[in-house]
Amino acid sequence: MIKLRLKRYGKKRNATYRIVAMNNTDRRDGRALEELGFYDPIHNEVRLKEEAIKRRLAQGAQPTDTVRRLFVKANLLPETAQK
């Protein structure tokens, strides 16, 4: 199963994340199938590749809870998609 999840980058206590499509059995920082965006929680910056995200969601990829919240804020998913 393909998951849309966060992959950690950055320094200690100064993390940034890339939003990636990965197999759900792969390690968090393992090899990604595709990079779909960027998230910096410290500066509250989000960059998304909307077409690629929509394509992955149409293929049946499941976002994690944190990624789902980012997509709802960016209006890529409806509010009811949140748990």
Curated annotation (Swiss-Prot):
Signal peptide: none annotated. GO terms for cellular component: cytoplasm; small ribosomal subunit. It holds the Pfam family Ribosomal_S16. PROSITE patterns: RIBOSOMAL_S16 (PS00732). One of its GO terms (molecular function) is structural constituent of ribosome. GO terms for biological process: translation. Keywords: Ribonucleoprotein, Ribosomal protein. Belongs to the bacterial ribosomal protein bS16 family. This is Small ribosomal subunit protein bS16. It comes from Thermosynechococcus vestitus (strain NIES-2133 / IAM M-273 / BP-1).
